[in-house]
Amino acid sequence: MVLQKSGSRNEEQVKVRGFDSRQVPVYFDGVPIYVPYDGNLDLARILTNNLGAVEVSKGYSSLLQGPNQMGGAINITTQKPTKPLEASLGYRQGWSRSQDNAYDMHASFAASSDLGYLQVSGSQLKQDFLGLPHGVNNDIAGKHGKMINSSADDKRGIVKLGFTPRENDEYTLTYIKQDGEKDNPPYSGNSGQKITLLAVARV
């Protein structure tokens, strides 16, 4: 499995055994998520707090999940409450070149019983700029340690209602509202290849 940023929109995408997101659909709690225009998805827009697991199916996958699973499927699941009452609140601050450039804040509340659970959560990740290395100071990449057109702002809210009448049965109703905005910095290199490999993982 390979994560990379590519394309004119500089989107983070995943490839499984050479297949991209059009042959390896991404699901969020079992619901497919993609852009109808071209079938792709910017994975960098998915906030990671309140996530329980990332399930990767390579090769054969269930037909109940729908079409376009030539290379497999990826299912991102949210956490479920394990206590009668749960609450969390978090804040993280990012720094670059001695300047605050980003922050991440999130809050969640959950209640559960033998019959089911209710979970409400919200989060925001805002980035003002990406830092540049020392010595980089030009009109294309950026000046004063700030890459131009590199800001991003993502917000997400989730309401999840679960019903567990028996030990092995679970029925959930999930509402997700997510808004995301990002700028696209210009390419400042001297090569026509615009793909940057970020990570390689074996599953």
What is the role of each PLM region?
Residues 1-31, 52:
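Extracytoplasmic beta-strand/coil segments of soluble accessory domains associated
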Residues 1, 54-56, 74-76:
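Non-catalytic regulatory/gating segments with a bias toward low-complexity or hydrophobic composition
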Residues 6, 66-68, 94-103:
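Solvent-exposed loop/turn segments connecting transmembrane beta-strands
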Residues 18-20, 28-30, 58, 78-80, ...:
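Flexible glycine-/small-residue-rich
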Residues 83-85, 90-98, 108-193:
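Periplasmic-side early beta-strands and strand-to-turn transitions of outer-membrane beta-barrels
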